[in-house]
């Protein structure tokens, strides 16, 4: 079996740059996922985020989750549960306006650490988007501009904990789905596994690795690249032992950003018989549709957007 792609970003600064860019290209085209090491976020920052996230779960969320499980009788289920996930979560919004001050139960140190971590992740996400531009033959900044809308991108972090589950064969930690947005940066537990992606009909484990950042591509990048890069189904398998920590940070288009295939990429494929044309739509409209269809196939979402394409009035962005 092929090895899960692990990319050392430091190698972009030396003689191995071309080979590293090729690895990123291959990961985007054939996996939709890759794992970054030497990504520039200090290990001590990540260690502090992990310590505070796990402490916050123990102090503020663990008991709440146990009460939820008891109230729904989940420990005694006999058949597969298809309408909920075995996870305890909260969401931090960073852009365009942060909600970190308003989220209840966070202590001041945790708020400050997460603000700093978010800034570092935002910078890394934008660096990655430019690397994708380079590999795609798009001008530098194209993807950031495509995501911008009138108020800049949406950026936020879903903080999740996946506690031990008595019936992991019947309840998923998180059901299979593709991500709706742009580019996703995941800081995951390095001891408790569970994340899997679907490749060539097989579920493949995403290996836990200390101080790494897992990257995956969302539906919007599939549209903008005209299918050259694809979002990939992934899920979290609940475990009988250990609580898995996951901080998934979503760098998404602004709500009013108009998303459509980059013209230069459509032109490059004009000679191909199987040219697939993706729709043009406002990102917020896609998200409203996704909210009810997250755990279903993405293709009907694209078709639904295509049916409403005539309503999209906004002009294309001025690059390409």
Curated annotation (Swiss-Prot):
For biological process, the GO terms are:
coumarin biosynthetic process; ethylene biosynthetic process; response to molecule of fungal origin
Annotated residues for binding of Fe cation: 177, 179, 234
For this chain, one GO molecular function annotation is: metal ion binding
Q: Which domain of life is it from?
A: Eukaryota
Known InterPro entries for this protein? Answer: DIOX_N, IPNS-like_FE2OG_OXY, IPNS-like_sf, Oxoglu/Fe-dep_dioxygenase_dom, Plant_2OG-oxidoreductases
Q: In which pathway does it act?
A: Alkene biosynthesis; ethylene biosynthesis via S-adenosyl-L-methionine; ethylene from S-adenosyl-L-methionine: step 2/2
Output the Pfam families linked to this UniProt entry.
2OG-FeII_Oxy (PF03171), DIOX_N (PF14226)
Q: Which cofactor does it need?
A: Fe cation
Q: Which UniProt keywords apply?
A: Ethylene biosynthesis, Iron, Metal-binding, Oxidoreductase, Vitamin C
Instruction: Give the EC number.
Output: 1.14.17.4
User: In the UniProt record, does the keyword Oxidoreductase occur?
Assistant: yes
Enzyme class (EC, first level): oxidoreductase
> Any idea where the Fe2OG dioxygenase domain is?
153-253
Catalytic activity from the UniProt record:
1-aminocyclopropane-1-carboxylate + L-ascorbate + O2 = ethene + L-dehydroascorbate + hydrogen cyanide + CO2 + 2 H2O
Q: Which family does it belong to?
A: Belongs to the iron/ascorbate-dependent oxidoreductase family.
Q: What is this protein called?
A: 1-aminocyclopropane-1-carboxylate oxidase 3
């Amino acid at each position: 079996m092929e090895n899960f792609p692990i990319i050392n970003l430091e190698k972009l600064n030396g003689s191995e740059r071309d080979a590293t860019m090729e690895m990123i290209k291959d990961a985007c085209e054939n996996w939709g996922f890759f794992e970054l090491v030497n990504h520039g976020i200090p290990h001590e920052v990540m260690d502090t985020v992990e310590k505070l996230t796990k402490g916050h779960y123990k102090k503020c969320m663990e008991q709440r989750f146990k009460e939820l499980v008891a109230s729904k009788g989940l420990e005694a289920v006999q058949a597969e549960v298809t309408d909920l996930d075995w996870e305890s979560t909260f969401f931090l919004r960073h852009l365009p306006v942060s909600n970190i001050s308003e989220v209840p139960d966070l202590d001041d140190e945790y708020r400050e650490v997460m603000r700093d971590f978010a800034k570092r992740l935002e910078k890394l996400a934008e660096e990655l988007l430019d690397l994708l531009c380079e590999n795609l033959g798009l001008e530098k900044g194209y993807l950031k501009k495509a995501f911008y809308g009138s108020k800049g991108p949406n950026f936020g972090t879903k903080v999740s904990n996946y506690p031990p589950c008595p019936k992991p064969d019947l309840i998923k930690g998180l059901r299979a789905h593709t991500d709706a947005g742009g580019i996703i940066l995941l800081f995951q537990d390095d001891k408790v596994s569970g994340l899997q992606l679907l490749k060539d009909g097989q579920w493949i484990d995403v290996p836990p690795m200390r101080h790494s950042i897992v990257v995956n591509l969302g539906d919007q990048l599939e549209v903008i690249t005209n299918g050259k890069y694809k979002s990939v189904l992934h899920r979290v398998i609940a475990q009988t032992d250990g609580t898995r920590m996951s901080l998934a940070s979503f760098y998404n288009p602004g709500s009013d950003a108009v998303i459509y295939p980059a013209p230069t990429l459509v032109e490059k494929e004009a000679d191909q018989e199987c040219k697939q044309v993706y729709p043009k739509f406002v990102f917020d409209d896609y998200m409203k549709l996704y909210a009810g269809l997250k755990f279903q196939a993405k293709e009907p979402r694209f078709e639904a957007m295509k049916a409403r394409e005539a309503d999209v009035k906004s002009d294309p962005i001025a690059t390409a």
